[in-house]
Amino acid sequence: MIARLTTLLAALIAVSPAAVGAQQSTYPPIDRYLMPRDAEIALARTAAPPSITEHATIKLLTRSGYVVAHQGDNGSVCMVMRGFTAPTYTPAMFRDLVYDPTVHAPICFTAPAAKVVLPYYELRTTLAMEGKSPDQIAAGVQAAYAAGTLPHRDGVSMAYMWSAHQHLGPGIGAWRPHVMLFAPNYDNAMLGGNPFGSPMPQVTDDAGTPFAVIVVPVDPALAVHLPAGH
């Protein structure tokens, strides 16, 4: 297990900057990011355990952004993030994932995160679909947060990313199921400095900012698979 994780970490460090940097710097046609409706609903439902997804709202990506395909009743929202929705803006080596239409990152925001965090990801998507560059998206998000048009983050909230079918980027693939803790202003030193890609909790996104994300890997046996026939 340790050897496998070490190999994965080496791949993340060695492959990701080159592979991501090699991505084109213009957006492919939006149709390359879109999925068939039923396939996207099924994939979104693999983001979390059925106890969450069976009662969650499901959103799908369309040419006009994310729209509700199924209205739930537990406050959670599940969807499939794309390259222009999912990547962090620090470390900067991942910014060009916005141009990669192969990224599929199923996620289920729990009710508090759906209220406070989801609008941030939807804004990033909107800005990308308007043709904004990664730097322009980052600036737009920061401006919206400063202006109060994005919800202020006062506490920690959570999302599931348990899909066995996620593709998080070149050299990363499905990695392993994990939860995302949206923890404003955390940095990795506060968690013990655990290395990127390790099985320990780590701050992977936007450390020291209101948008900081802690990734907590979970048992790979918990990965949620598509039902037969999909």
Model segments located where?
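Positively charged n-region of N-terminal signal peptides that target proteins for export
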Residues: 1-4
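Bacterial N-terminal signal peptides
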Residues: 6-17
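Boundary at the C-terminal end of the N-terminal hydrophobic targeting segment
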Residues: 18-24
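Primary mode marks residue(s) on the alpha4-beta5-alpha5 output face of response regulator receiver
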Residues: 24-230
